[in-house]
Structure formats: C-alpha cells, structure tokens
Amino acid sequence: MKIELKSIYHSVQLSEETEAFTANLYINGVHAGYAKNEGHGGNTDYYAKDEKGRELIRQAEEYCKNLPPIEYPADKYMDAFSVNMDLEHYIDDQLYKYIEKKETAKFNAKLNKTMLKGIVYGVPDQSYGAITFNLPIVNVLAHPKGPQTVLQTIKDKILPKLKEGNKLLNTNIPESIIKSAGLKEEQYVKPTIQNIRYGTITDVDNNKNNRGRSR
C-alpha cells in the first residue's frame, strides 16, 4: 500500500512541542483525506475527504498495524524502546522525511555557494566550516601559484580538522591536489574534477619527475 503526504505546509514558527503542518493524505494514488498537527504537543490528526477516503483510511490503518514497530535506540537520556506502528506514526514519519529532505537541500545549496569562495570541511549534510579566499576558488586555481596555495592550505589548516566524521567537502578542487595534500579517500567527498588543469603543483610535479627518473 502506498501512503503519501502531498501539498505539505510546515510551519517552523508554529512548531513548539511537535511539528506544525497541514497536508493532503493520499492512499494508493487517491486523495483520501487530510492530516494536520497544530504543533502544541498533541497527536497528529487525520480525517477522510469523503466516503471513499474513509474506506481507504480504514485499509491504511489495518496495513500500518501489521508493519514492524518503530525502534528508538538508547541515548544518554533514555533506554532503547519501541513503539507499535499505526497510521498516525506512519504519517509523522513521512513528514519527518519531508522536513529532513528539505533541510538537506537548503544545507547543500548554502554549502555549494560557500565552496565557490574557499575550502569547506565538515560533516556531510549536517554542519561545515570554511576557509575563504579573496577571489573565487576557480580564479585562485587559475593562478600559476594557486594550486600550490590551495594544497598547502588543505595540508596545514584543513587536514588537522578532519576527525570525528569531518571531511573535506569541496567537489570543485581537483582530486590530484587533495591527494597531494595527504588526504585519504575516506577524508574527502569525491570531487567532480580529477586532475589539475591550471598552474603547477610542486608535490605532483616532483612525483612525476621521480617516476620518470626511476624508469
């Protein structure tokens, strides 16, 4: 069975103890009813649009009762526990996924804007910090000494911060620079640029020369 929320309106301002929202409830592609929560800590309510919607909601309730319970892991405040699934919890879960997706998109849009101006590091989809340049990073890389400047900045200022889940988040820095700075693959997000196109990188050039002399 397919249970969906559409035309979701989520209010951050009205969300106090619970998430305040309104949405259309669709079951198997049919607009069956509506769902809402006023944000004051009460239950999420849902109700049918018409007689057909009432029957679809009844079927959805039965369907959700047979789904696995929701498992909540232990943390420093409470022990692990589980809650039996029902349609209300299913609707709440759909809402949380919607909010998370929206927040992730907002986060990534801000991140992408920041990485145009500098070197960005942090926990993917959660948090980040940045070291910015006076010029856009593409202009820095175009300068003859730019690649070496970026490499040295990563090595001296970013690499020491790459712990506790932090990674280099730039996708616009050539991977050859990142590797020359000493980063392992698990310490950075895969960039869209593989090799340097502008300027020179001393470490890379020296490695190439050494390989050439060893043949």
Task: Go through the PLM ranges and name each one.
Residues M1-R215:
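Terminal leader/tail segments of proteins
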